[in-house]
């Protein structure tokens, strides 16, 4: 399976004109590699992102029935190579192809696309107790929403907040990651979540 090369909460101040932390995880993949829906849900935003460091991106909202978690969860897939063939309000299934991996997005310091970013997915996850959200300047903002470590999603249960995750005993921090294989098979077959890239059989 494809791994993470930039973790969440990494200091991004050197990349920005201000203090900043990385709000997700990055996983490099060749151009065109399908980005997969981490869970079943509804498309709530698609941004072309011409003036955004995230470039072209998709945001899904996952309700409690989708995940089995009593919260509203939002997953974000950024740096798509092209606009996805999806519509706002469309339902997607866990493991569904959302769009091709690319390297879209501007260099925040230069203010334009320098074309040097390696192709990768920027995968971010937020959670909220309310289904309400707003869209503002290329961002989906959940009401009373919180960022979370995307890896915590794969626990499939509460708690999800970073402080609680940090406080877990070391033995409980390892999370088995359910996946979609490159032939579309889910492992385990009844999983509600998958890694946002397909894995390949040995």
Could you say what each language-model-derived stretch is?
Residues 1-56, 63-65, 94, 107, ...:
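Surface-exposed, glycine-biased beta-strand/turn segments
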Residues 20-22, 53-55, 72, 116-121:
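Short, solvent-exposed loop/turn segments at the edges of secondary structure
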Residues 26, 76, 100:
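Conserved beta-strand positions that form and line the central face of beta-propeller blades
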Residues 30, 36, 68-95:
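Short histidine-centered loop motifs in beta-beta connectors
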Residues 46-47, 61-63, 78-81, 101-102, ...:
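Active-site-proximal beta-strand/loop segments in catalytic clefts of secreted hydrolases
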Residues 50, 69-72, 83-86, 105-116:
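Short, charged helix-to-loop "capping" segments that act as catalytic/coupling loops
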Residues 51-52, 65-72, 132-134:
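Short, solvent-exposed loop/turn segments that connect beta-strands within catalytic domains
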Residues 58-59, 90-169:
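Conserved, short, structured surface segments that act as functional micro-motifs
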């Amino acid at each position: 399976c494809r791994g993470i090369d930039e973790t969440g909460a990494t200091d991004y101040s050197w990349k920005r004109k201000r203090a900043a932390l990385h709000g997700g995880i990055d996983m490099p993949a060749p151009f065109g590699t399908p980005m997969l829906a981490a869970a079943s849900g509804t498309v709530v935003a698609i941004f072309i992102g011409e003036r955004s460091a995230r470039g072209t991106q998709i945001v899904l909202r996952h309700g409690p029935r989708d995940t089995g978690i009593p919260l509203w969860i939002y997953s974000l897939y950024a740096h798509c190579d092209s606009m996805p063939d999806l519509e706002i309000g469309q339902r997607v299934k866990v493991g569904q192809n959302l769009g091709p991996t690319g390297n879209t997005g501007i260099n925040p310091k230069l203010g334009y696309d320098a074309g040097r970013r390696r192709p990768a997915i920027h995968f971010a996850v937020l959670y909220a107790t309310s289904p309400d959200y707003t869209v503002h300047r290329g961002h989906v903002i959940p009401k009373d929403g919180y960022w979370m470590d995307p890896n915590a999603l794969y626990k499939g249960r509460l708690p999800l907040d970073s402080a609680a995750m940090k406080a877990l005993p070391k033995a409980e921090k390892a999370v088995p990651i359910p996946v979609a294989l490159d032939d579309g098979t889910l492992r385990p077959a009844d999983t509600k979540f998958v890694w946002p890239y397909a894995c390949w059989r040995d």
